[in-house]
Amino acid sequence: MKPDAHQVKQFLLNLQDTICQQLSAVDGAEFVEDSWQREAGGGGRSRVLRNGGVFEQAGVNFSHVHGEAMPASATAHRPELAGRSFEAMGVSLVVHPHNPYVPTSHANVRFFIAEKPGAEPVWWFGGGFDLTPFYGFEEDAIHWHRTARDLCLPFGEDVYPRYKKWCDEYFYLKHRNEQRGIGGLFFDDLNTPDFDHCFAFMQAVGKGYTDAYLPIVERRKAMAYGERERNFQLYRRGRYVEFNLVWDRGTLFGLQTGGRTESILMSMPPLVRWEYDYQPKDGSPEAALSEFIKVRDWV
């Protein structure tokens, strides 16, 4: 089947609505919407929930940008895109909870298509979701990865292991020699065997995110915590900022190509702290995190 960008856009708009409704139902607060237009073509809907009952900040962004030609930074890596008009659309979200026992989560699904008259379109899907705990709970990690594995199974037995590995490799802070969290799924450049198959997989990932995340939120949101746990959460959020500004391809691409800065940086935690040469106490739950986030097979 020929790629249908309109069908993908409708799914993404509905996905943004659904995820916002689900997060609001857990939190009790509502999202505030900020619609925006891009001068060069396209626009989006940024939605943010701040200082809710459960979430300190949750941002769910939809964007759809288009143009007559790709930026040089993109065609340098993919010369086949030169001289083509393009559309790029996606939903991207990050949730930063109040409670340090509730992990931070991130999800993204996206579609890209570049066309020119008389030629076959170049298109692909990408996306995934990943979890960043501050305190490790094995049952949460197993549930997260089991949900990821189960949504992948209809698409092939090799899909989950392949995209889990890609996620582990992508969300890695080289300058710290550590993972950002416990991973999940990450895929890009997906365009085989055909459009329908790839679109169905992207939909499964988009819908699977809340199945993976919300049970963990419900399990942990009422756990008692104090200043020690909060300080550790803020310290570990620093790793999130470091990854996004130093290593994340999407953030860098957006900032380098004149994307909407407010939406791109919506993923940042509202409060964060750094501490020189921080060393957690031996045997403490904080010290256990470095071992917990090391790459392993959870299911």
UniProtKB/Swiss-Prot annotation:
Its EC number is 1.3.3.3. Substrate binds at residues 92, 108-110, 258-260. The record marks 175 as: Important for dimerization. Its main location: cytoplasm. Disulfide bonds: none annotated. The keyword rRNA-binding does not apply. This is Oxygen-dependent coproporphyrinogen-III oxidase. The gene is hemF. Keywords: Cytoplasm, Heme biosynthesis, Manganese, Metal-binding, Oxidoreductase, Porphyrin biosynthesis.
